Amino acid sequence: MREVISIHVGQAGIQVGNACWELFCLEHGIQPDGQMPSNKTIGGGDDAFNTFFSETGTGKHVPRCVFLDLGPTVIDEVRTGTYRQLFHPEQLISGKEDAANNFARGHYTIGKEIVDLCLDGIRKLADQCTGLQGFLVFNSVGGGTGSGLGSLLLERLSVDYGKKSKLGFTIYPSPQVSTAVVEPYNSVLSTHSLLEHTDVAVMLDNEAVYDICRRNLDIERPTYTNLNRLIAQVISSLTASLRFDGALNVDVTEFQTNLVPYPRIHFMLSSAPVISAEKAYHEQLSVAEITNSAFEPASMMAKCDPRHGKYMACCLMYRGDVVPKDVNAAVATIKTKRTIQFVDWCPTGFKCGINYQPPTVVPSGDLAKVMRAVCMISNSTAIAEVFSRIDHKFDLMYAKRAFVHWYVGEGMEEGEFSEAREDLAALEKDYEEVGIETAEGEGEEEGME
C-alpha cells in the first residue's frame, strides 16, 4: 500500500482536519464509529481507501492521522464530537497551556515538551504502514501552535523520515481579515522553515474562501464550518486519486515532480470552482466550463491575482463524469487564451488526473451535488503577492521592534527575525527571476555563470 499520514497541528489544522475526515468517511461509506457496513462499500471491494484508513481486527477503520495542539480546548471538541469513536485516544495529543499566538512558545518553550509525544504517535502510525509515501501537514501560520509547533514538527520529520515527501496545507493570514496582531511575525518565522522542510505547500487563506462562500455559494455570513468544508472538498479532490481507483491516478510524489521546478519555488495556489445547490438545479457544467472557471481569479483559494503572474505548471484533478478527450479539448482551449500566461521555459505545463468517483457532499452542507468537478493546484509567480503583503506588515512592526519582547522572552534571539525576513526577501526575488523572460537575457546569462 502507499499510505499517507495526516498531521493536524493547532486550531486551524484540527478544524480543517475535522471537516476532511467527515468528508472522507462519507465518501467511503464509513460510519462515525469507524464501521463500514458491507452493503455500502462503494466501488465494490476497492481497497484504495486504506491509504488513509487502517483497519483493526474488529473491522473498524481508523484514520491514519494525529491531531496535535498545545492547549486542550480544541482537541476536547474532537474527543466529544460526532466522530469521537473514529479516532484512537492516542491520536489526539494535547498539552496543558496553549501557545498564546506566540511562535516562540510553539517552537521553543512549550512545543519542545510535547514534540516527542507527537513523534511517538506518528512513529506508531508509520509502523503500521507497509509503504508510507509521505505526510500531509495541516496548519495555519498566523497563530502560535500551527506556526511554531508546526515548523518544529516539520524539522523533526525531515530528520526522522528524510526521504518521505511532505505536503503542507497551510492557512495564510488574509489581507483584510486578521485574527491576531502578531500574525506577520508568526508567518514569516514559520515560512522560513516551510521553505526548508516541505516539498509542496498549498496556500489557503480565509478571506479568499469567505469570498467564494459568499459569491459562489450565496452564504451571507459564512462560518468557519462553511470555510472548512469548502477547504475539505479541495483536499478531497487532491487526495481522491490516492483513495479511489481512477483512469489517471496521481501519487503524492507526482505532485512534486510536476509542480516544483526549483526546490524553493513550491508554494501552490489552489482553486476549486463550486456552485450552490440552487444554481446546480438549473445547470450542469461541462468539462470545458469547469476548467475555465478553475482559472478564474474568483475561484482561487488564496488572495492573489494569477493574471499578475505567470504559471509554471498546473495540476488539474477531475472527478466524476469526465473523459480524457474532454479534458484534452478543455486544456487546448486554455492554452490559446491570452489571459492565462505560462513562463516561456515551460511550454506544456499541464498535469491532469481523472477520478471516476463523483464529488460527495456533506448532508445539510452548502455545496451542490454535481456530476463532475475539478480542482486545480498551480504554481504561479503571482503567489509572491502573498509573501510581499506579509513582509510589508512584518517590516512595519519590526522597524519599531513592537511585540518582539514576547518572543525573546521565550528563548528566541532577535537575529532569527532578521534571518527569516531575509530568507523571505530572497524568496520574493526567486519568484521574480523565475517569471522573467529567458529569451532576452541570454547574453547576460553566460557572464553570470
UniProtKB/Swiss-Prot annotation:
InterPro entries (alphabetical): Alpha_tubulin, Tub_FtsZ_C, Tubulin, Tubulin/FtsZ-like_C, Tubulin/FtsZ_2-layer-sand-dom, Tubulin/FtsZ_GTPase_sf, Tubulin_C, Tubulin_CS
EC number(s) on file: 3.6.5.-
Gene Ontology terms: cellular component: cytoplasm; microtubule
Location of this chain's protein in the cell: Cytoplasm, Cytoskeleton
GO terms of molecular function: GTP binding; hydrolase activity; structural constituent of cytoskeleton
Enzyme class: hydrolase
Catalytic activity: GTP + H2O = GDP + phosphate + H(+)
Modified residues (N6-acetyllysine): 40
GO biological process, one term: microtubule-based process
Pfam families assigned: Tubulin, Tubulin_C
Entry keyword annotation includes Cytoplasm: yes
Function: Tubulin is the major constituent of microtubules, a cylinder consisting of laterally associated linear protofilaments composed of alpha- and beta-tubulin heterodimers. Microtubules grow by the addition of GTP-tubulin dimers to the microtubule end, where a stabilizing cap forms. Below the cap, tubulin dimers are in GDP-bound state, owing to GTPase activity of alpha-tubulin.
PANTHER family: TUBULIN
Name of the protein described by the UniProt record: Tubulin alpha-2 chain
Organism: Stylonychia lemnae (Ciliate)
